[in-house]
Regions:
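Extracellular glycan/ECM-engagement signal in secreted proteins
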Residues: 2-47, 82-89, 93-178
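Structured domain cores in non-transmembrane regions
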Residues: 46-98
Length: 178
């Protein structure tokens, strides 16, 4: 009889040292505090609807929007590094039916993929969290896709607006319980 063992990934910790939990609200904040604020919804090109994940300016008095993490594995309550999960802003939007994060198509002018919001039950809405050099990165690399072109979330400044996008330098984040 074969015995298999699977190593348990360490839990992702919030700024209080507690494991992230399914359904609990958190702010996603930069681990480098002098470059920008918490994550929120932003619009591109002065569009009337904020349909993209972005970052508050460092000088803003807005605290951003809280998110919840929803592991794709039924019954999983603790968020471990590498857990496949959905990320959802806990805010109402009159512009979108869902505030769940998803990866958009590659932009031809930047070669980057922006993170937007909207209905997404497929792989475009599945993220994970990894730890690198003591900070956390938000990653997109759904296992069900046979390892597509994976990416780490970073910040791309477009017309003065800080937007979350893949395919550039990773941006370190931390999680603050709301």
């Amino acid at each position: 009889m074969a015995i298999t063992s699977t190593a348990q990934s360490p839990p992702v910790l919030d700024t209080n040292g507690q494991p992230l939990r399914r359904g609990v609200e958190y702010y996603i904040s930069p681990a480098i505090t002098d470059v920008g604020g918490n994550l929120t919804l932003k619009s591109r090109s002065n569009a009337p609807c904020p349909l993209f994940v972005g970052q508050e300016p460092v000088t803003s008095t807005n605290i951003g929007l809280p998110v919840t993490f929803r592991p794709t594995e039924a019954g999983k309550d603790i968020i471990d590094e590498g857990t496949s999960l959905n990320i959802v802003f806990e805010a109402l939007s009159t512009c979108a039916t869902s505030t769940q994060w998803r990866v958009d198509a590659t932009e031809s002018d930047t070669g980057r993929r922006f993170v937007g919001i909207g209905d997404e039950d497929g792989p475009a809405g599945i993220f994970g969290i990894s730890r690198d050099n003591g900070a956390y990165n938000i990653v997109w690399c759904p296992a069900m896709m046979g390892r597509p072109r994976c990416g780490r979330a970073g910040i791309l400044v477009e017309n003065g607006v800080r937007l979350v996008a893949l395919d550039g330098d990773a941006f370190p984040f931390e999680f603050i319980k709301a």
